[in-house]
Amino acid sequence: MLKISNRGGLMPESPIRKLAPLAEEAKRNGLTVYHLNIGQPDIATPPAMIEAVKNNISPIIEYSHSAGNESYRRKLVTYYAKHSIDIKYSDIIITTGASEAILFSFLGCLDVGDEVIIPEPFYANYYAFAVLAGIKVITVSSSITDGFCLPAIENIEAKITPRTKAILICNPNNPTGYLYGKEELIQLETLVLKYNLYLFADEAYREFCYEGSHFSAFQFEEASQHVILIDSISKRYSACGLRLGAIVTKNKLVIDTIMKFAQARLSPPYYAQIAAEAALDLPDDYFVITKAEYQNRRNVLIQRLNAIPEVYCPNPGGAFYAMAKLPIDDCDKFCSWLLKDFSYKNTTVMLAPGTGFYGTPGMGLQEVRLAYILNTESIHAAMDCLAEALKVYPGRVSKK
């Protein structure tokens, strides 16, 4: 009998997508499913991006430069300068989504068996890409009771071993929505300098900060050789399907190394770069309007969640995600039950089980991630559905 690889056996299922067959079956049965499980915004992709592609139809769809079109990278330099990130276009490698940026960063900076420290809960695909790269994720737990702030720095330092080569931070955070402040990032800078570590900084949601402003890890001059910035246009411009991201670093050795991986996959998507370059010409008020819409959705979601008996959800400071604690026995069972065995007014709701965002077994059992990417009317309807579901769920666990 043929066997699969050990690596394939270790690859985790996506907590965000693994319930998709159940949702599809629910829809075939006539239910409306409110998708709060995945960060796919319903806000329209800017028309200028689509028009740019239409206006650049070529009889031959060519490879681009392996690092990405120079014109796009040069315009990105101006974009980053607006965020107090001072770089040259040669400090940028365009990738096929932030996913490839994460994988290339792991492959270029860490060896098999090396360790990367990540506060949990964390974006589930970090673990998947660590498996692909043969590295080990070391988690440090944050808590819903304090809003998922950065774990105590001494707890992070206690996890450092001779195999530790990096710390990874997502700011604002997916899945919690927590916005790390400058003082928290300074503590991480101190650690990476003290122990000579890389700091992978996933900043894909920097435009969406509601409680304070975004501070980039790239603004630490002393640690500039240590910081690898991971970026994406997916959520910024509601263009997830374009699959375009970036790696940004002033460390030339890292750029030269990652460039070899970029050359091996030939080039990032041709038309995605044309669309993304056009997006950089959008007026500044594009983000003012978009941010205000997400903030309004956040406010509705958090108010509705915390109004449900025995539900608690801290107020996220950024991105468009929230982690909530529910009075349930098992989030995986509950999320499946919502799609298989429950409906309210011919609707149900799809959530992402919290366990999939933790590396520590048993953590997140009563938590779910919700993405507030639907309009407020749909969020209200989804919360009506969730409130009714919690009244009748067989595995409800009430506080004593």
Question: Language-model features: where?
Answer:
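PLP-dependent class I/II
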Residues: 2-4, 9-14, 19-34, 39-56, ...
